[in-house]
């Protein structure tokens, strides 16, 4: 009789555990997905920070020239060329 009760008790535990196992498995899966999404979000922030640092790592002279755009300088080019030509004469 004791062995029969032991087998039935173990079967009951096994059935209970199998239902809980599926729930636990789903919870773990959801937690892992959330962790992955959070890590990806943090990685995106780190990549943006690194890109900004790479721009700021330029030499001071290069940073000075990066500020100037062609549209700002282009209207003055004919005058600069004329002045340069006049200086050669």
Curated annotation (Swiss-Prot):
Residues 19-59 form a propeptide. It comes from the Eukaryota. GO terms for cellular component: extracellular region. The keyword NAD does not apply. It is found in: Secreted; Target cell membrane. Its main location: secreted. Residues 1-18 form the signal peptide. Expressed in entodermal epithelium along the body column. The keyword Endoplasmic reticulum does not apply. This is Arminin 7519. It comes from Hydra vulgaris. The lineage of its organism: Eukaryota, Metazoa, Cnidaria, Hydrozoa, Hydroidolina.
């Amino acid at each position: 009789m004791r062995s029969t009760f032991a087998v039935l008790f173990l079967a009951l535990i096994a059935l209970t555990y199998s239902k809980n196992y599926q729930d636990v498995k789903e919870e773990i899966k959801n937690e892992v997905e959330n962790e992955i999404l959070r890590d990806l979000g943090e990685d995106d922030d780190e990549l943006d920070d690194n890109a900004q640092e790479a721009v700021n790592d330029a030499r001071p002279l290069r940073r000075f020239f990066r500020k100037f755009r062609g549209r700002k300088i282009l209207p003055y080019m004919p005058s600069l060329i004329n002045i340069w030509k006049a200086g050669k004469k």
